Amino acid sequence: MRRAAILAGEVVQSTIGLLKPGIREFEVGAEIEYQMRKRGASGPAFETIVAFGERAALPHARPTAKRLGKNELVVLDLGAILGHYCSDITRTVYMGRAPKRIRIWYGAVLEAQAAAIAAAKSGAACGDVDAAARQVLAGYRLDHLFVHSTGHGLGLEVHEDPRVARGQKKRLEPGNVITIEPGVYSAGIGGIRIEDDVAVHAGRTEVLTRAPRNLIEI
């Protein structure tokens, strides 16, 4: 799984380097799959999510013919299958100079992710990991814009137990691999999501995906 996660991080970074005004979502999606296979993946772990501008407000947006414009958010959510194991990573970038509101929102999501990763220890209830992310976003008055769970299990399938969601009492165990993917979404503005794969070990956690998490402005 570590290799699949590293591969996904490499692909998302190479894809960000290709973004430019006028490129279409489905062109980016096709490039992502090409880059995966070029690096040895047997294919994508799920249908790649590519969303520009207002469409980034859709957490599960599929690539369309929409062209990338200036001053738009870009959400890239992708995963690869390598050695039968799945990975899952999301990064959000901004085409242009991000306005203050986007910077604040991005910082809040990044802080929420860090809090959830810190909470994702062996023995922790999955609902408490989810709550850690929501508590941070509530501090920014953004929790109402977080419309999905914080994460899910990952392995031979892209969605497995445990669910990192509200009220989940199941406790994390060494050997679990989960995603941590808080996000905020607003119609007319777009969305911001940051996702990484986290392995739970006895006494520590390990982030398997390797790609910069800072706000990238193109």
Residue ranges and their predicted role:
Residues 1-218:
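Active-site neighborhoods and metal-handling regions in enzymes and metal-associated proteins
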